[in-house]
Amino acid sequence: TSKEQLANMMVGRPIQSELPRAAYNPGAEVLKVSNVQLKDANGVALLSDIDFTLRAGEVVAIAGVSGNGQSELLEILSGMRLPTSGKVEFLGQELPYAGRANADGLPAAFRKLGIGHVPEDRLRDGVIKDFSVMQNTVFGYQDHVKNRWGLFDFKKIAQRCAGLMQAFDVRPNNPDLRIGLLS
């Protein structure tokens, strides 16, 4: 079986094997990962000597067999996990891993820098299934929906939720619906 036949069988239709390539003009360096390593609690290496640079306009895929560290690398890049060693720079600024005992507060700090994270399994890791759509829109943005006394401002929460539901065409348009019922 040729590569082309195998690819056609995988997608269920003939595919174009040669795609026209646009000129490659890499932009400024956006993300630089240098010698990132991660060990588990027993000292077993989960990531070893990870090095790469991402430039503006590039699309990079991190691929591998399940269990080979892709998820762990993305968790490091989004501040959800600390590397054992190494350095990560975003827009020329070193990300603040050093001197920390844990990753508490890093995801919020990274969001302020413009770094986001879309989990592999959004129902397992991205939402609380038994909470409403509106309640789930608060997570990670608590400081933006509080009133002057530091309490949640439910009008702001409802406005934020309505805006997100409209922007992403969430159906049915019911902010009180349990998010675990959505597809």
Residue ranges of predicted features:
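Glycine-rich phosphate-binding loops of nucleotide-dependent enzymes
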Residues: 1-183
